[in-house]
Amino acid sequence: KVHGSLARAGK
């Protein structure tokens, strides 16, 4: 999913 990408960059 897309949220995985932002989650990795966010943390």
Curated annotation (Swiss-Prot):
BP terms from Gene Ontology: defense response to Gram-positive bacterium
A GO CC term assigned to this protein in UniProt: ribosome
Signal peptide: none
Keyword Ribosomal protein: yes
Keyword field contains Ribosomal protein: yes
Family note: Belongs to the eukaryotic ribosomal protein eS30 family.
Function according to Swiss-Prot or TrEMBL: Has antibacterial activity against Gram-positive bacteria.
Protein name: Small ribosomal subunit protein eS30
Organism: Oncorhynchus mykiss (Rainbow trout)
